[in-house]
A protein has these predicted regions:
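Surface-exposed peri-terminal alpha-helical interaction modules
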Residues: 1-152
Length: 152
């Protein structure tokens, strides 16, 4: 499980870049130009396409918003109180297996990749929220264990 010490600006930036790439892949996979017409012969396929497109893009929007909140926190634009109060990552349902079955393997893999990405962020968020805000940072705790005084 992620600990508070594992969240830092570099990790958030890396995850943010990954989220942007994944979001762009989702956008291209679910671009509806021509896909709805092709699927219109089967209503169930059209419903599955619409539902999973909405679910997957919303999952990625929530992920990007969570990452933007953490970027703002590390840039000093949000306080820890604001981040804890308003920056929680929402729970999000996974794709329904029967709907996933109508997609080609590449689209299914993309949907599952967004689910895994969201689950990673959720673990990081939960680990960060479990930390006591008054507890010393990992560096301060290490210094204390080593008996080194902080420079100041």
């Amino acid at each position: 499980m992620a600990s508070a010490a594992s969240i830092n600006p570099r990790i958030i930036e890396g995850l943010y870049c990954e989220a942007l790439v994944l979001s762009d892949e989702v956008r291209s996979a679910f671009a509806l130009s021509g896909r709805l017409e092709a699927a219109s012969a089967e209503d169930e396929t059209q419903v599955a396409l619409s539902c999973e497109a909405l679910r997957t893009t919303t999952r990625m929007m929530h992920s990007v918003a969570w990452l933007l909140n953490h970027r703002a926190y590390f840039n000093g634009e949000l306080s820890e109180f604001q981040l804890r109060r308003y920056g929680k990552l929402s729970d999000f349902p996974e794709a329904e297996p029967q709907r996933l079955a109508v997609f080609d393997g590449e689209t299914r893999a993309l949907i599952q990749a967004t689910e895994r990405f969201h689950a990673r962020l959720k673990r990081i968020d939960l680990g960060w929220r479990e930390r006591d805000p008054a507890a010393p940072s990992a560096i301060a705790a290490l210094r204390e264990r080593l008996g080194v005084q902080a420079r100041g």
